Amino acid sequence: MANSANTNTVPKLYRSVIEDVINDVRDIFLDDGVDEQVLMELKTLWENKLMQSRAVDGFHSEEQQLLLQVQQQHQPQQQQHHHHHHHQQAQPQQTVPQQAQTQQVLIPASQQATAPQVIVPDSKLIQHMNASNMSAAATAATLALPAGVTPVQQILTNSGQLLQVVRAANGAQYIFQPQQSVVLQQQVIPQMQPGGVQAPVIQQVLAPLPGGISPQTGVIIQPQQILFTGNKTQVIPTTVAAPTPAQAQITATGQQQPQAQPAQTQAPLVLQVDGTGDTSSEEDEDEEEDYDDDEEEDKEKDGAEDGQVEEEPLNSEDDVSDEEGQELFDTENVVVCQYDKIHRSKNKWKFHLKDGIMNLNGRDYIFSKAIGDAEW
């Protein structure tokens, strides 16, 4: 009894420490602008590290306890060949790291139905699964595959390589056979006319994959040029390379677009290239900068070839020559001083001057204060 009580107390102690630490740092994380999901991932990682160290027996997270319960419920069904356990993925095309003895792969939708992609682990080793980087939703979503789903599937990796997954006869591992890869490329406009604005046009690409799997839908960004002439806007499509027989390019409205079309008159478009819908890339920006530099060089060459006449610098007429300076001071009765205050009443002025020198009738006078009147 004492040993059993000790076994139940130690996991609770560790869990209480983890909960206290997470609750204490939650406010600090929120003040620093860190999302709470990061805190939950930290908690999950901490629990997984503790379970991997085997320092505490019976320490299981809620997700793993749910996995064990589901496995026990579906144990009679696992003995039949037409039932399999799988995990629904939380993010598209993301594999889950696990221990060496667990075979787990990412499998797309079946041939008969457009079901979401799933992660299929080995049913015999599901209790040893390492869910270090799995979220709570992905770990808890443990369902049974419907009848009719064969164990032979195909997957599409992040790098574009198509792999075929074949379950071995012993049911303990999967064999990957590389197939043809499908790569969706982005077509970039080679050059653009002066005064044009580049507008992205989205097209759907239906690429049938080998093995009879339903076509995978991708997106190709086809840039176009928009020329603004007055109140009209002309759209000039760029030439697109001929597709392969395994691909068919279809526009978003369902009409087939030829490789080259004449300029069409359309209503003015308002383009948005910022935010989540931004389709501009670094390559497009680099090409636009190179084009602007080339245009400036062409203008400089044209100006040098046409006139080759040196233009007068800006504000050249504002420069004061020495002759103008001499004419300005060739006057009599000059006063150079500081003014203390000035009063004005209609056309009468009264000056209070100080610390100055004045030239009157060819003689210089120095004064500290002076008062004068004038009318004009």
Swiss-Prot record:
Outcome of swapping residue 273 to A: Abolishes cleavage
One cellular component (GO) term of this entry: nucleus
A Pfam family hit: TFIIA
GO MF terms held by the record: DNA binding; protein heterodimerization activity; RNA polymerase II core promoter sequence-specific DNA binding; RNA polymerase II general transcription initiation factor activity; RNA polymerase II general transcription initiation factor binding; RNA polymerase II-specific DNA-binding transcription factor binding; TBP-class protein binding
Record keyword Metal-binding present: no
CDD domains: TFIIA_alpha_beta_like
PTM annotation: The alpha and beta subunits are postranslationally produced from the precursor form by TASP1. The cleavage promotes proteasomal degradation.
Gene3D superfamilies on file: 1.10.287.100, Transcription factor IIA (TFIIA), beta-barrel domain
Mutagenesis / variant outcome for changing residue 30 to V: In a breast cancer sample; somatic mutation
One Gene Ontology biological process: transcription by RNA polymerase II
Keywords: Acetylation, Nucleus, Phosphoprotein, Transcription, Transcription regulation
Stated consequence of mutating residue 277 to A: Does not affect cleavage
Modification N-acetylalanine, positions: 2
Cellular compartments annotated: Nucleus
Family: Belongs to the TFIIA subunit 1 family.
Function of the molecule: TFIIA is a component of the transcription machinery of RNA polymerase II and plays an important role in transcriptional activation. TFIIA in a complex with TBP mediates transcriptional activity.
Name of protein: Transcription initiation factor IIA subunit 1
Organism listed in the record: Homo sapiens
